[in-house]
């Protein structure tokens, strides 16, 4: 008799799941032990190798398992323990797994094999060049939100759909699937305006200024923003320096009802939760692909109840979009997807050749925002102009003013001080205002020769700010004083690095020594 082919691991799990007798109550139950292990957002379980459950179920390390307590259940990655950390009758849980099940130390929980995930087949098909239809995209996103995917599965999804591997229908399907994956806000107002920047340009923190001007004019602008993925600060990170941003949906509605606008963290309101999960992995992989970018942006806008959207699209040698051709391609795609999901949308292509403002990092960017809103003499002119340009475009898109009158209207509100008053009122409504501060340590970087500033590498100056500790340390980052075209002499100040620890300052300075072309002076 010939040898039978050995089934692969996935097939074995399927056979085990379908053919195995239903376990008795005692077979698959273990006593919970809280281990205090931080695995970020990934559910992880720990069981001894000689546990009766491991032996009876045939569990292997990194197996995906379902853990149940009453009506609650989670999916976790299983780690096998070969020590006395746990007893044979115990199961250890990571912090996120423990809190998700709402249990206590010593509770009994059940552990079983995870049923096969059909949606993984769609990802495999995509890897081999197939197209994923709307049904497949819905199943993928549903499994993402339910926590059925491990970090490995999430990484494979992001990689399979990265670059230009998504066609228009796939992007629309992903956007719609992400919209229905979470809550949606419905407003009393028929028109709700919004703004987004595709990112990649450090210091481009126009949002709080735009929200303040628009809200002061009486329009509704509930701005849900993201945290940084690959940059020194996201809008939510920067706003959080000055006011709470992790608000419930009920609280968001209350703030907007009172003030007409808000600037909050999108995931705090459970808008497009699939996007929040994917962003965590994209940040680790340093990937931000075209189709997923569009789906991420537009799904949250629709979920937030927006009807009119202006998109800031910076173009430059060291930002996400390197050419006008690339910007126009993304512009067309975004407008097509926006139309498919019911958004009135306008893309504004802007200059991305250098950082905006002075600060790079949450607290330092917050200082720039306040300087513009307060109409201070030394406020960054480029941040002010960008904010007014985009606000004007939004006012015209909404039909609030005639074509060509948007900038002028926005400038009057800003200059009058009404925008700053509105900003402070929004901060108070969100939970209270806090003045931004500098980090503990600082180090000045000077020009080593005279000349004209010819170029600034946005990615590298951002890297300096991140090595300094931003955005995790909100007060850390860079203050930048050498814009394009500026004549500098040897010894002139180019930028200042701010850190909370001496170690982070050391790493930032080591990077500056290695990368001599962060600022090119000729």
Predicted regions and their residues:
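Well-ordered secondary-structure scaffolds
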Residues: 40, 129-139, 143-146, 184-186, ...
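Acidic, glycine/proline-rich low-complexity segments that act as flexible tails and inter-domain linkers
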Residues: 114-202, 241-242, 422, 426
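Glycine/serine-rich anion-binding loops at beta->alpha junctions
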Residues: 192-215, 219-231
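Long, compositionally biased stretches
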Residues: 5, 11-128
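Active-site-proximal beta-alpha loop/turn segments in soluble metabolic enzymes
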Residues: 158-162, 195-197, 235-238, 273-283, ...
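Phosphate/diphosphate-binding glycine-rich loops and adjacent basic-rich segments that engage nucleotide
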Residues: 259-308
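A glycine-rich helix N-cap at a beta->alpha junction
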Residues: 238-262, 332-338
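Self-splicing inteins and homing endonuclease
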Residues: 177-198, 254-280
């Amino acid at each position: 008799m010939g040898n039978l082919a050995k089934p692969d691991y996935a097939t074995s799990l399927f056979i085990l799941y379908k053919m195995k007798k239903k376990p008795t109550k005692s077979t698959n139950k273990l006593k919970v032990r809280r281990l205090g292990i931080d695995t970020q957002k990934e559910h992880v379980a720990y069981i001894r190798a000689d546990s009766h459950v491991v032996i009876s179920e045939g569990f292997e390390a990194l197996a995906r398992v379902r853990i149940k307590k009453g009506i609650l259940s989670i999916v976790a990655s299983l780690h096998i323990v070969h020590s006395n950390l746990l007893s044979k009758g115990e199961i250890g849980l990571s912090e996120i797994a423990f809190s998700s099940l709402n249990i206590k130390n010593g509770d009994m929980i059940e552990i079983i094999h995870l049923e096969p995930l059909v949606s993984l087949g769609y990802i495999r098909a995509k890897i081999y060049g197939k197209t994923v239809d709307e049904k497949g995209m819905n199943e993928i996103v549903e499994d993402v939100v339910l926590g059925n995917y491990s970090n490995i599965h999430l990484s494979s999804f992001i990689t399979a759909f990265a670059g230009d591997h998504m066609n228009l229908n796939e992007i629309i399907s992903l956007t719609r699937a992400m919209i229905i994956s979470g809550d949606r806000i419905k407003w009393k107002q028929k028109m709700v305006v919004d703004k987004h920047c595709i990112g990649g340009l450090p210091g481009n923190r126009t949002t709080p200024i735009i929200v303040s001007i628009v809200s002061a004019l009486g329009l509704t602008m509930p701005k849900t923003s993201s945290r940084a993925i690959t940059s020194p600060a996201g809008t939510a990170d920067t706003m959080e320096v000055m006011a709470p941003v992790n608000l419930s949906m009920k609280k968001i509605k209350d703030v907007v009802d009172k003030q007409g606008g808000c600037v909050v963290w999108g995931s705090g309101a459970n808008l497009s939760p699939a996007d929040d999960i994917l962003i965590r992995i994209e940040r680790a992989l340093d990937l931000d692909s075209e189709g997923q970018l569009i789906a991420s942006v537009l799904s949250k806008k629709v979920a937030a109840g927006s009807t009119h959207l202006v998109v800031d699209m910076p173009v430059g040698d060291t930002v996400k979009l390197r050419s006008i051709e690339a910007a126009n391609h993304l512009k067309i795609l975004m407008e097509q997807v926006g139309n498919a999901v019911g958004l009135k949308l306008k893309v504004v292509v802007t200059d991305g050749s250098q950082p905006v403002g002075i600060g790079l990092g949450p607290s330092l960017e917050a200082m720039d925002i306040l300087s513009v809103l307060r109409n201070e003499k030394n406020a960054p002119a480029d941040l002010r102009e960008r904010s007014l340009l985009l606000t004007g475009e939004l006012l015209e898109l909404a039909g609030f003013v005639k074509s060509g009158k948007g900038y002028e209207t926005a400038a009057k509100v800003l200059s009058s001080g009404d925008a700053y008053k509105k900003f402070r009122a929004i901060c108070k409504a969100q939970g209270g205002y806090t003045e931004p501060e500098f980090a503990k340590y600082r180090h000045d970087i000077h020009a080593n020769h005279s000349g004209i500033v010819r170029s600034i590498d946005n990615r590298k100056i951002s890297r300096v700010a991140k090595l300094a500790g931003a955005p995790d340390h909100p007060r850390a980052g860079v203050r930048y004083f050498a814009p394009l075209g500026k004549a500098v002499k040897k010894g002139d100040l180019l930028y200042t690095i701010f850190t909370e620890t001496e170690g982070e300052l050391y790493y930032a300075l080591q990077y500056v020594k290695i990368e001599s072309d962060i600022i090119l002076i000729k």
